[in-house]
Amino acid sequence: MCRAPMPSTVSEISRIYHQPLPDLLFEAQRVHRAHHDPREVQLCTLSNIKTGLCPENCGYCSQSVHHKSGLAAQELSSLDAVMAEAQAAKAAGSTRFCMGAAWREIKDGPPFERVLEMVRSVAALDMEVCCTLGMVKPHQAERLKQAGLTAYNHNLDTGPGYYPQVVTTRTYKDRLETIRAVGAAGISVCCGGILGMGESLTDRFELLESLGSLDPTPESIPINCLVPVAGTPLADSSPVEPLDLVRMVATTRILFPDAMVRLSAGRLQMSEELQALCFLAGANSIFTGPKLLTTPNPEHSHDQKLLEKLGMEPKTTQ
């Protein structure tokens, strides 16, 4: 279980973030080396097992029924299709396979039973298994754990003050309750946020403060950069400043020494140099493969070449 060092108030987080960049990167790298192999990067693959028709109104998401993104809806994938993806991901070097469904919440019944069978089958490949399926009740979290689920992803997205500007159909409290249910079942918590939705630096610091208040703190923290999608409310958002991303990664690493800091959405828009700086700042995981749910993402071969250039290597053990 992970605990964030104290203090982690907004003012303390701001102090860490605003250090001169050489000092910030030095401290982040020092912490990173004390807790992780600095040459290793865990490769993860995310599969969209049910696409579109989500009743939530998350302003960034192409899968919402409230937006006109033109995305074609797809029903829950078959077990054979999911296993083919998982086996290909493992062959390409991924050690964690994540399955995402565009649901508001898990509902008991045949679809959930099919997801449980997917979890059991992927776990049998000796891979870490993660799901992101919306809100989850305690008894459902227990069943996922029994099926072999390693981690459950449920992002806070942003700080609590800015959150209502992004989502109104699900409260911050709803998200926290799901995270508590997952943790209570003994499932690792994967929880992070999205940068570039119009939030302020203070909103980003409040996100980190909220993550630090979780007990246990997340084992996995995805840091996403918004990929604007036509037809969504955030389609015209400005890109995240590169050094703002680097500072956010470094600050996250310092605050959460044991966590896997996952450089997630938006990598296709990042230069190799920016990604290298993020690794120096303490990122030690990426999502690899042609898509991240519905948005384009670097292919496995591209990521393998990047790691080779940097003298880094995929993490081979769970």
Swiss-Prot record:
Name the HAMAP family on file: BioB
- Gene that encodes the chain: bioB
Query: What EC identifiers does the entry list?
Result: 2.8.1.6
The function of this protein is: Catalyzes the conversion of dethiobiotin (DTB) to biotin by the insertion of a sulfur atom into dethiobiotin via a radical-based mechanism.
What is the protein's given name? Biotin synthase
- SUPFAM superfamilies, sorted: Radical SAM enzymes (SSF102114)
Q: Does the keyword Hydrolase apply?
A: no
Q: Which reaction does it catalyse?
A: (4R,5S)-dethiobiotin + (sulfur carrier)-SH + 2 reduced [2Fe-2S]-[ferredoxin] + 2 S-adenosyl-L-methionine = (sulfur carrier)-H + biotin + 2 5'-deoxyadenosine + 2 L-methionine + 2 oxidized [2Fe-2S]-[ferredoxin]
Which coenzymes or cofactors are required? Answer: [4Fe-4S] cluster; [2Fe-2S] cluster
Could you tell me which Pfam families the record lists for this protein?
BATS (PF06968), Radical_SAM (PF04055)
Gene3D superfamilies, A to Z: Aldolase class I
Q: Organism source for this protein?
A: Gloeobacter violaceus (strain ATCC 29082 / PCC 7421)
User: Which of this chain's residues are annotated to bind [2Fe-2S] cluster?
Assistant: 98, 130, 190, 262
- Radical SAM core domain mapped to chain residues: 36-258
EC main group = transferase
Pathways per UniProt? Cofactor biosynthesis; biotin biosynthesis; biotin from 7,8-diaminononanoate: step 2/2
Keyword field:
2Fe-2S, 4Fe-4S, Biotin biosynthesis, Iron, Iron-sulfur, Metal-binding, S-adenosyl-L-methionine, Transferase
